[in-house]
Amino acid sequence: MRRMTLLLAVMAAVLVVASGVALARDFVGTDRGERIVGTDSADTIDGNGGDDTIIGKLGADRIRGGNGKDKQYGGRGNDVIDSDGGFRDLVNCGRGIDTAYVDARDQVAGCERRR
């Protein structure tokens, strides 16, 4: 019984990988600057502190840069980018109908809605 369960679990994992399905994930950064790259699905990404580079890729992503001078790229999909942390950030929403919460000092491109 255990072998059958293990075999079925392995087969399911192989099918997911082979089909190219990217499962959505939650990413949380640290207080150091880092590069965080999402999946091809709808992700939730929080850069936390530091000067981060965040790339959402495909899917309707929710991206929050946090404290620091962040570079945030939404990619394809209807993304929500939160960049109103008081630092001068770079926000590029990408393709899709995107919403960006930004400060007056942020450099913003490709966002259909700015708040």
Regions found by a protein language model. Name each.
Residues 6-9, 30:
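Short helix-onset patch at the extreme N-terminus, typifying the N->h transition
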Residues 82-115:
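Leucine-rich solenoid repeat scaffolds
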Residues 8-17:
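Bacterial N-terminal signal peptides
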Residues 29, 38, 47, 56, ...:
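Glycine-centered beta-turn/loop sites at beta-strand termini
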Residues 1-5:
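Positively charged n-region of N-terminal signal peptides that target proteins for export
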Residues 22-58:
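N-terminal segments that cap or nucleate solenoid repeat domains
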Residues 13-14, 26, 30-35, 53, ...:
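Alpha-helical transmembrane bundles and membrane-interface segments of multipass inner-membrane proteins
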